[in-house]
Amino acid sequence: VNNIQGRQAERARFGYLGGYVGRLVPVLLVVISLSLVCNRTASLQNQNQAPPPPPTLGLEQGLLEFDTPDFKLKLVKASQTVAALQPKTAPGFDFTPSDRLERRASNGFYHLGDITLRVRTDKTGPWQELDTAKARQPVISLPTSGRVLASADLTPTLPANSPVQITRSWVVDNGQLSLQFEIKNKTSSGVEIGALGLPMIFNNFITGRNLKESHELCSFFDPYIGEDAGYLQVTRLNGHGPALIVVPDRNASFEAYQLLNEPMRPNQTFEGSFQWMVHSQAYADAEWKNAQPWITPTHLEILPGASKVYSIKFLLSDEIRNIEKTLIANQRPVAVGIPGYVLPMDLDAQLFLNYSPQVSSVVAEPAGSIIVKKEKPTRNGWQAYTLRGKTWGRARLSLTYKDGTRQTINYYVTKPETQAVADLGNFLFTKQWFEDSKDPFGRSPSVMSYDRDAEKIVSQDSRVWIAGLGDEGGSGSWLAAAVKQFGQPKREEIQKFERFIDEVLWGGLQYKDGPNKYGVRKSLFYYSPTDLPNHVYDPSLNWTTWTSWKKPDAEGIGRGYNYPHVVAAYWSFYRLARNYSNLIKNHPWEWYLEQGYQTTKFTFSRAPNGRRRVGYVDLGLMEGDIFLAVLSDLKREGWTEKAQEIEKLMKERADRWRQEAFPFGSEMAWDSTGQEEVYAWCKYFGYDDKAKVSLDSIIGYMPTLPHWGYNGNARRYWDFLYGGKLRRIERQLHHYGSGLNAIPALAAYRETPDDFYLLQIGYGGTMGALTNIDQDGFASVAFHSFPSTLKWDGYSGDYGPNFFGHAFNTATYVINHQEFGWQAFGGNVKLDGDWVRVEPLDSFRMRVYVAPAGLWLTLDSGTFSEIAINRRTHVVRVGLSPANEYTSDARLRVEQPARISGVAQYRPRRQLIVERDAYKIPLTKTVTVIELGTK
C-alpha cells in the first residue's frame, strides 16, 4: 500500500483506497485509517511483518571494491557477500538491492555469495542444515593472488559440528566474474550433500517505490531450470539493457528453484528471494515428496579429505533480446523451440540447438511422450529436430552432449488446439453450468467458478466475488465461455449463454434501469445473514474478513476492471449475430453492439457532477483491447456519432498516459495488466513513444526460456490470493498475464516482423493459455511453481482473461527465418517446389500472418484450411473451409501492418464485394481458393 500513496487521493474519489484494498474494500468518502487498511491487507496474506533482529552483516566494517571488465563489484568486508553489482554500461544502476542493505543486515536475510546445504555423514540419518545467513560471524579472509579478487573461509558462519569446510572465492576468469565454492570433507567418513543452494539476491524490492523508481531501479529474474544448460536471467523492469545472465561454471547444474525463508515474507511488492538448487534430493525426499520435479533430483558424496568445487559465472548482455546471442558467444548451450514448448498433438514442432559438441542422446520422459526425429543441421550448424507430442501433459527431453553436458527441456503436450478449446467449451457448459431457480442471489442460469479437487461448482467462498460472477475470479468462467463462442461457435452452448445474458447478466450482474443503468456490480453473491436468514452459509468458511462483502458492498459499481468482461461478452455475440446465420436468436446484432457501446460509454464517462462513475478507468484495464474492437466495429457499421463519442473518451485517457513516464498504474502497487490497453490506445492515437514504453515494460517481465511454464509467462505472483484455491504469494505459471500481454507483443511483431523475439514471447504467452486446460476441459487459474507443489490450482478462478488473450490472439504465423528457414507458429509447413504450403492448426483458424510480406489475413466468418505462398512470385493462395449450416460466406480482411521494402499492396485477384472492410466470399461444399497478389 505504501508505495502508491501518490495515487491514493485520486482513487479515494471513487470510494477506494490504493493497493489491495482498492480492489476489494469499498469505503465511504471519509477519513479512514491507513493502518487499518494495511492490517486488512496483511490479514489476507497472513504476512504481518515482525521487527527485524539486530544487524549482523558487519556493514560498519566497510566494503571491498573491485573493478572487473563488466562490473563494479562491492563486497561487505566482514561477510564477503555482495553489497553492489553495477554493470559498467549502465552507470548508477545496480542489479542487487544495495539501497536495502541496512534493512537486510540481520540474520536470516540472504545476499549474493551465501550458500545453503543439507549434509549428513550417516546415509540413513537426519540431514544437518548448513546456512551462511543463519548466524553470521565475520568470515576469515584468505590471501589472494592473480585472478582471485577475494577469498574467505566460511567456517565462522557454520555450526561448530559442520562436517565440511567451505571456502568461497570471487574470481575473474577469462574476463568474467565468477563465484566459486570449494567444499571440503573434514571428517574420516563420507559426507553426503543432499541439497546445495545458491541464493540469487537481486533487486526485486518494489516496496516503498513509485512506478518510476521501480522501473528505473528494479529487476525481475527468471529461471531456466535446465541442468548444465540452465541459467538465471535478470532483466530490468523498464525492459532496457543490460541484462544479467547467471550461468553454471563448474558442477553447478540448475536443478530446482526454491523460495528462501527470510524475515521479510513475500507480498504484492516483493515476490521473495530465491535460490538456485544444484542438488535437491534431501528436499525431494521430504518437503517436496508429493511433487513431480522439473529435473531428476541429485545428491553427491564427498569422500574423506576430498573437496568439490561449485561455481557460477555472471555474463552481461547488452539488451534482453540478445540474451541467447550472449549465451552463444560464451559457448553456452542454447535451445530455440518453434512454436515454443507447448506441443499440440497434431503439430510438427521444431527444436534447434546451438552448442559445438554434438548431441549424443535424446531421451523423452515419460517414455514415448514425445517423438523426436533428427533433421539436417542449419546452414550455421544448429542441430535440428522435429518433435511430435504423443502423451498428454507434462513431458521433458533430456539431452546429453558429447562433452558430458546435460540439458533438460520441459514441454507440455496438449490435445490439438481445436479439440482442447472444444473440451473447454463442453466443460464450461456442462460441469460449470449452474441452474437453480431458487438461488437467492440470482445467479441462475450461468457458467460459474469450479473446484476441480471437489468436482463441484463453487457456490460459496468467503471471497464472495468467486461465487458471485464478479471480479476476475468470478467472471472468469463465463468470460471464457463467451469468447470461446466467438472463435468456435456451437449452437447448443450459445443457447445456454443467451439465457445467461437475458436472465443473469442484463438486469442482474449489470443494472438495466435506474441511475446505474449499464453499471456492473462487483458480485451477485454476498455475505448478509440478516438479509437472507434462510440461506445457510458454509460454517467452515471464515466470513469475518473484508473479503466477505455485505449486500451494499457487492452491489457497488466502482471497479472498472469488471467492465471489459461484460463488453467482451456482448461484442463476441455481436460478431456471431452479424457474421453467421441462425446462431444467435435472442437479439439482433444491433442490440449486442448497442450493449457493448453503452457499457463502454458508461465505464468511461462522468456523472453530471464531473466525477467518474467508475474507478480505475484512468488506468489500463485487463482485456482493454475489447474497447478498441468495439470502436472499430462502430466505425464499420457507420455508427459515426457513437464511434466519435467513444474515441473522445479514450483519447482523454491516452492523453493522460502520454504525460506519465510509466503509465501502468493499477489497483496494485505494481502490475502487469495495464500495459496491454495502454499499448493499444497509444498506438491508435499515434503516441508511438509511449507505446514503446509499454512494450519495453512487457519485455522486462515476459521472457522466452526453454521451458513451457516460463516461456511467454508474464510475471504474476499474487492472484492465487484472489482467485486460487491454494492461497499464497507465488509465481503463477500461465496466469492471465500470459494471454493478455501476448496481445501487444504480437501486435508489435506484426509491424516489425524481423523482431523474432517478440514472436517468441507473444506466441509463448498465447500457447501458454492452453496448458491450463486439462484432458476433460477444466481450465485452472494457473500452475503452482513452488517445487513443493508443481501442479495446477484446483480452482478455475480468473482463467477467463487468459483465454480472452488466447482467443484475441490465436493465429498461424508463417516466417522465413534467416537461420531456421520456413517455419510456422501454429501450423505445419510443407515445401512444394516454389510453394510453401501451411496448414493452420491454431484454435480458431481465422487468422494468418505471412511475415515476409507483412500480410495479416483475418476472417470474421469462415476458417482457413490452407495458406500457400509462392516464393518466386510472392502470390498468396488462401484456402477457405467448406460452407456449413451457419456459414455461407467467408469475410476476409487483408491488412499489411508492416511496411516492408519492395512489397506492394495485396488484394484479391478476382472481383469481390466489400462489406465492413472485409471481402465477402461465397463458400461452396468444397474448399474455396482465393488468390492474393500485388499486381
Question: For each predicted feature, which ranges?
Answer:
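Short Pro-Gly-centered flexible turn/kink motifs
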Residues: 70, 300-318, 924-931
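Low-complexity, Pro/Ser/Thr- and charge-rich linker/hinge segments at domain boundaries
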Residues: 206-210, 325-346, 407-449
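Low-complexity, acidic Ser/Thr/Pro/Gly-rich terminal tails and inter-domain linkers that flank the onset
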Residues: 154-173, 319-336
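Catalytic domains of carbohydrate-active enzymes that cleave complex glycans
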Residues: 309-311, 439-487, 499-934
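Extended acidic/polar, glycine-enriched regions
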Residues: 357, 361-423
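Acidic-aromatic substrate-binding/catalytic surfaces of carbohydrate-active enzymes
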Residues: 54, 59-160, 207-283
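Acidic (Asp/Glu-rich), glycine- and aromatic
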Residues: 78, 159-166, 171-230, 405, ...
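Bacterial N-terminal signal peptides
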Residues: 24-36
